[in-house]
Regions:
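Dual-mode signal for accessory low-complexity, basic/Gly-rich regions
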Residues: 51, 67-246
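Residue-level signal for secondary-structure boundary elements
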Residues: 22-30, 56-60, 168-172, 227-228
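Exposed alpha-helical structural elements
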Residues: 10-13, 63, 159, 214
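Extended amphipathic alpha-helical scaffolds
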Residues: 1-5, 37, 45, 49, ...
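Catalytic cores of large soluble enzymes that bind and process phosphate-bearing ligands
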Residues: 2-10, 24-26, 37, 56, ...
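Internal alpha/beta scaffold segment
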Residues: 1-48, 52
Length: 246
């Protein structure tokens, strides 16, 4: 409804974001802790979901080939497909081929639990079909070295910044790509430096490089602040030992 739209709050948020980005500085190249804002965090998870597509695996263009049932990532990485959550963006009873969906783990404590196998590829590979892709991927909350009680947790971006103490907060990606065969990536970023959990100044014109397996094995935090309107329920996330170059 038009009456439910708070245009003034939206414009105020956009203005604040623009003002905070005035006067960016370059940081020295090096290894930093990296926090990724929930508005762009799915950029780093999308290549993982793509690599779990059986079409890529059958064509041998996936860096997660021959990974089903194996522990590839750390205990802190659990990705669920919450396809049957009523009334939520992305939820559905069937995929476009008519295969029934279900709530299920895609990655459970670092173990690959599912490939996405459509009916055509299932016949080519001689395996049972699943759903063709994730309906509503949800990254579960995590903080390295801390026990988070189910149903009693709230981990915001502010909490993650305080947990990481010092590093770079990424709020946008400026181009770049990842290699689907090797998992190597290079992305341009923009965002803010932070110290003692507080944002200090904007940064631009930096690159992050590495390998997606290594990156996700350096996961140290995942929040509970995924955007409700998004099909990809990916919260703010944090990694350690990320290579930045100016």
């Amino acid at each position: 409804k038009e009456a439910d739209l708070d245009c003034s709050a939206c414009s105020a948020k956009a203005l604040d974001k623009a003002v905070r980005q005035i006067g960016p500085k370059k940081r020295k190249s090096g290894s930093y802790r990296m926090v990724v804002d929930n508005s762009v965090a799915s950029r780093l998870l999308a290549p993982i979901a793509s690599a779990l597509n059986a079409s890529s695996i059958q064509q041998k263009v996936s860096f997660l080939e021959d990974s089903l049932g194996k522990k590839i990532f750390p205990d802190g990485l659990t990705l669920m497909d919450m396809a049957r959550t009523p009334g939520k963006s992305g939820s559905r009873l069937f995929d476009t081929e008519g295969v029934a969906t279900k709530d299920c783990p895609i990655i459970d404590r670092g173990v690959i639990k599912q490939y996405f196998v459509n009916t055509y590829i299932s016949r080519k590979m001689g395996i049972e079909p699943t759903v063709e892709d994730a309906s509503r991927p949800c990254l579960m909350p995590y903080m390295k070295g801390k026990e988070l009680a189910d149903g009693e947790i709230s981990v915001s971006l502010k909490d993650i910044l305080q947990f990481c103490r010092n590093g770079i907060l990424v709020t946008g990606f400026n181009g770049g790509n990842s290699n689907p065969v090797t998992g190597d990536f290079s992305f341009g970023i923009e965002g803010f430096a932070f110290r003692n959990g507080k944002i200090t100044h904007p940064v631009r014109e930096m690159l992050i490089t590495g390998n997606l397996k290594d990156l996700w094995n350096n996961l140290i935090a995942a929040g509970t602040d995924a955007r409700p309107s998004s099909r990809w329920q990916i919260p703010s996330i944090a990694f350690e030992n990320v290579s930045f170059s100016a």
